[in-house]
Amino acid sequence: MPISKILIVDDSRTELAFLRDLLQKGGYTVCTAENADEAFRQLAQDRPDLILMDVVMPGQNGFQVTRSITRDPQYEGIPVIICTSKTQETDRVWGMRQGARDYVTKPIDAQDLLAKIRALG
């Protein structure tokens, strides 16, 4: 399935702005959420083709949200790429075990992220 609409979940407005600009320039439609509650509202409202998920957020962390999304049949087929400052291998492995399709560490390399998105779609 081609990817055209991407949900970015990150509590940092700076990261949201960076990713939104990058993806819009790449031709993607973008919606954003700053926490888990907003993410689930956006999922229900907009049904994105891909989710970029931060890990360190208030309330539910990105690992928990990723697990909820990837285990829920109504969101089947929506891939999640974790985008986080957590660089430990144990975090990367845990993220993949929660159902993430890929794991990108911050600071994000724009061309690498775009290549990963294209590879999924």
Language model feature labels by segment:
Residues R101:
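Short, glycine/charged-rich "phosphate-handling" switch motifs in NTP-dependent
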Residues G27-E34, Q42:
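Short hydrophobic/Thr-rich beta-strand motif most characteristic of the beta2 strand and flanking loop
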Residues P58-G59, E76, Q88, K106-P107:
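The feature encodes the CheY-like receiver
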Residues A17-K25:
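Charged docking surfaces used in two-component/phosphorelay signaling
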